[in-house]
Amino acid sequence: MKFVVENKEKYSRVSCTLEKLDAQHSPELKSELVHLNKSGIKNIIIDLSGTRYYNSSGLSAILVANRLCKGVDGIFVLTGLEPAVAKLVTISQLDTVLNIAPTLAEAEDLLFMEQVSKDLESES
């Protein structure tokens, strides 16, 4: 399995088991993300802790996840970035657009805090 999906109560976590997320594998990730979205999943955490490299195709898949979540008023969080991957995210200024957390536990906390914030805004 290249991508492992774990459905939780409030979100789905997609873990990438690939060392490289490139043009060969990004379409499969995009397909999985679209499937989750069409299944009613609003909140997604992508865990890239095992991924050492990705290119523009990998970035595109990550942006698809962000767009799909936002399109249904959901939350997207990226976690487990290796230093080289984190550098690429910073260089491309995606760190200003995406919710990024260093660890899975922090990603879950961030997702829950964002959800509480949205719930409070909708009650106002």
Regions found by a protein language model. Name each.
Residues M1, D95-E108:
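A short, terminal or domain-edge coil/loop segment
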Residues A23-L98:
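Amphipathic alpha-helical interaction surfaces in cytosolic regulatory modules
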Residues M1-K2, K87:
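Intrinsically disordered, low-complexity boundary segments flanking structured domains
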Residues C16-L18, S60, I100:
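Generic secretory/membrane-interface signal
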Residues K2-V34:
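STAS-typified acidic loop motif
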Residues K10, P83, A105:
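Residues that form or immediately flank small-molecule/cofactor binding pockets and catalytic motifs
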Residues P102-S124:
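A charged, well-structured terminal subsegment
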